Design a protein with these regions (language model features):
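Extended terminal accessory/targeting regions
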Residues: 2-131
Length: 131
């Protein structure tokens, strides 16, 4: 079972890198708002939310709220599909995860998404400035 969970997580990360082709203004605004209010987590490692966590959050809050936790979108996919969203910056749907932003920068650089790379970098700078 454990190896299946690792495979599932690897596939989620692979799909997260799919065809994200645009920044998500709602996600960027929400992340900046959380950073301004101090709702930031600084764990030593990054944990992508599980599919179960995503599904539970989506069922409880709907697509509009779900969309706020992602810095990028794939405009080729419907807005009410998980495939539409990428570059998640939270591990708990409550806080901005600093290590998640670092992971986003790395993936965005690999995928040539300079606007997402820059947005995540500015967020990290804001977090670090509050220390």
């Amino acid at each position: 079972m454990k190896s299946f969970e690792h495979l599932e997580k690897a596939l989620e990360l692979l799909f997260d890198q799919k065809a994200i082709n645009k920044t998500n203004p709602k996600g960027i605004a929400h992340a900046n708002s959380l950073i301004a209010s101090g709702d930031v987590k600084e764990p030593s490692s990054w944990e992508h939310p599980t599919a179960e966590m995503e599904n539970a959050y989506l069922e409880a809050n709907g697509w509009d709220e779900f969309s706020k936790w992602y810095l990028g979108v794939d405009t080729e996919m419907g807005a009410e599909t998980k495939g539409h969203y990428g570059y998640v910056y939270t591990s708990d749907f409550k806080t901005v995860d600093r290590q998640g932003l670092r992971a986003i920068r790395q993936r965005a650089a690999q995928n040539g998404m300079t606007s997402i790379f820059a947005a995540a970098g500015k967020m990290i700078e804001k977090i670090d400035a509050k220390k």
